[in-house]
Amino acid sequence: MVLDGFAAYFDAYLENIVREGKSEHTVAAYRRDLEELFALLAQMPSEDAGGVPQDLSRRDFTAALRRLSQRGLDGRTLARKLSAWRQYCAWLVKRGLMRADPTADIKPPKQPERVPKALPQEWLNRMLDLPVDGGDPLAVRDHALFELMYGSGLRVSEIHGLNADDVYLDEAWVHVTGKGRKQRQVPLTGKSVEALKNYLPLRQTASDGKALFTGRNGTRLSQRQIQKRLESWAAQYGDGRHVSPHMMRHSYAGHLLQASRDIRAVQELLGHSSLSTTQIYTKLDFDHIARLYDEAHPRAKRQDE
């Protein structure tokens, strides 16, 4: 049975990526994707899946992908799962437990390019400039959280992981631990500094006292709690539009890129390893870019001007 061979090193692999510093979220995702693969391979006829890692072929993995596709999974999800499988196979090959990686030449399903949704700048300014009840610690906390979310473009996981000593208000920057434990420094807006100065004296602290954003009991806000606070705020004061932490980050990236035209700087601020990841934000507002072109390019001006 393939699980006796291919899956025999599963626990050792997970222990290895934990040692490499992968986040709990990433490790859990790899675990789910690989356990799903093992289950799919176990369901295949014996002639389709071998008993030891060397017996596995490209056909086994394409068959597993095909079954997942038949369940209605989209291309992006299938590509992510294939990536997890490929990394496990590469780890086995590196340790001499497989002769070759059978996933190496499998192309991930083609994914339609998705342009991120950005919130209107005027709407965000209006929402963030709403009066804050200084006597309500949670309202003061949420205002600081939302200012930081839009003002510095942090991922919800990064905000969740912030400690109070990661924030340097006098210098107006924040120390962020991003994907893959990568460290970066991100500037704080004047509005964020002001909101954090109002919040920090009211902050509830648990025994260790490290977390920047905490609940009533002083414990660190979870990613889900942060998301729900944002949704509640938008529902209460907004116009009914859906708002998520991811949209706040997209808005930061798009608005900053429109103003600066410096894609490399935006890449650094967002913590993107690849410039191609940042380039999708160049498609956020083609009308805005077209207007800049009309105003700036000498050949774009009308003859009667």
UniProtKB/Swiss-Prot annotation:
Keywords: Cell cycle, Cell division, Chromosome partition, Cytoplasm, DNA integration, DNA recombination, DNA-binding. The active site is at residues 155, 179, 246, 249, 272, 281. Residues 1-93 form the Core-binding (CB) domain. Coiled coil: none annotated. InterPro entries: CB (IPR044068), DNA_brk_join_enz (IPR011010), Integrase-like_cat_sf (IPR013762), Integrase_catalytic (IPR002104), Integrase_recombinase_N (IPR010998), Integrase_SAM-like_N (IPR004107), Recomb_XerC (IPR011931), Tyrosine_recombinase_XerC/XerD (IPR023009). CDD domains: INT_XerDC_C (cd00798). Its main location: cytoplasm. One of its GO terms (cellular component) is cytoplasm. Residues 114-294 form the Tyr recombinase domain. The keyword Metal-binding does not apply. GO terms for biological process: cell division; chromosome segregation; DNA transposition. Belongs to the 'phage' integrase family. XerC subfamily. Forms a cyclic heterotetrameric complex composed of two molecules of XerC and two molecules of XerD. Site-specific tyrosine recombinase, which acts by catalyzing the cutting and rejoining of the recombining DNA molecules. The XerC-XerD complex is essential to convert dimers of the bacterial chromosome into monomers to permit their segregation at cell division. It also contributes to the segregational stability of plasmids. NCBIfam families: recomb_XerC (TIGR02224). This is Tyrosine recombinase XerC. It comes from Neisseria gonorrhoeae (strain ATCC 700825 / FA 1090). The lineage of its organism: Bacteria, Pseudomonadati, Pseudomonadota, Betaproteobacteria, Neisseriales.
